[in-house]
Amino acid sequence: MTAPPAAPARASVLALLAFLAFVSLGLPDGLLGVAWPSMRGDFGVPLDALGVLAATQTAGYLTASFLSGRLLRVMPIGTVLALSTLAAAAALLGFAAAPAWPALLGFAVLAGLGGGAVDAGLNAYGARHFSARILNWLHACFGVGTTLGPLIVTAVLGAGQGWRWSYVLVGTAQLGLALTFFLTRRRWAGSASAGAAPAPDPARTRDTLRRPVVWLGMLTFFVYTGVEVVAAQWSYSLMTLERGVPPAQAGLAVSLYWGSLMAGRILFGTVAHRVPLVATLRACLVTSVVGALLFWLEPTPSLAVAGLMLIGGALAPVFASLVSLTPGRVGGAHADSAIGFQVAAAGLGGAALTALVGVLSRWGGLEVIGLSVTVLAALLLALYEGFVRVGGEGVGPGQATTGPLGATQVPDRGAG
């Protein structure tokens, strides 16, 4: 049966809206690393309190991500996007107005709830309805946000304004996005193509959690996000406070890191359907270890920055590609919950490992940051190999059919 003519146009509109949602997710992450030295001075907290702030935000993020499977069963994805983006906007404006450290932590919980619902919901939706190409471009849009974030803070500080104005700007933009998602929320209903296989009944949460491949996937995402976030959030402090890099140059270096993530995802999206995915991801993870070594050992300042960019470029396709393979590894009945668990584990890894590196740097000096990134990158490579061994390669040739925007439709492996 031929799909209605409106179906491709609707799918394209939904992809565009998903791209906008991921830009909005990336903006706050890009702000924090550069704004933090100024923020901690205003609130009178030590440098490693960044880990406390990240952990607090992750409490909300984990709650929303872990419960995303249940949330999507009772609330349409369009409504989830509208409400969660509104919550994130309110949190960012709260950051700008926070009079004291406890208030900032409260707004961090709200920011986590909003971001976690958008992240897990769109990843679960995208794994079913978007191709690996679109998923990589989706995560590239996160990179657009994280690349713009440091530039916004650097420009605001360079203009002699306080860091709070950068949060006002981004929070106001997110209010506009929340309105857009509210007005278009009904477009997400019934978006599957006419020829797509019906989704299996979702498995019980405890049945999904009984699968070893789900736990190994969660651990892989935990460490992956640890590498990405530690490199992003601590590199500015290392360069400015330990290595004597001027603030403007260090801010540019962080933007280049996020930019390499964005560019890598855009590039990989154009070739994702033509390369052997497992071998390509393995090569990317090996390259990330090389980049981490350059950043840590700093043969020259330029090579250290190049290493930071190499980490970003090499990690670029990993998250989205692993998400796209999840339905094939765990089965359609387990996919939504498994992806929610993976996103939750990713959020926990970003917060917990950022906090751990902060404590270690306070004890052993800021150069511990480069060593930590290197060790985590090597651990990620080892975990990936274990994930492939236990879970297989996901959907192989001949196992899949095509859905909206080239989405992979996988056979169900059972709900038990």
What are the language-model segments listed below?
Residues A64-I77, G264-P276, S361:
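Helix-to-loop junctions at the C-terminal end of transmembrane segments
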Residues F107-F142:
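Cytoplasmic helix-loop-helix junction between adjacent transmembrane helices
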Residues V275-L322:
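C-terminal transmembrane helical hairpin of 12-TM major facilitator-type secondary transporters
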Residues G332-L366, V373:
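A late C-terminal transmembrane helix in Major Facilitator Superfamily
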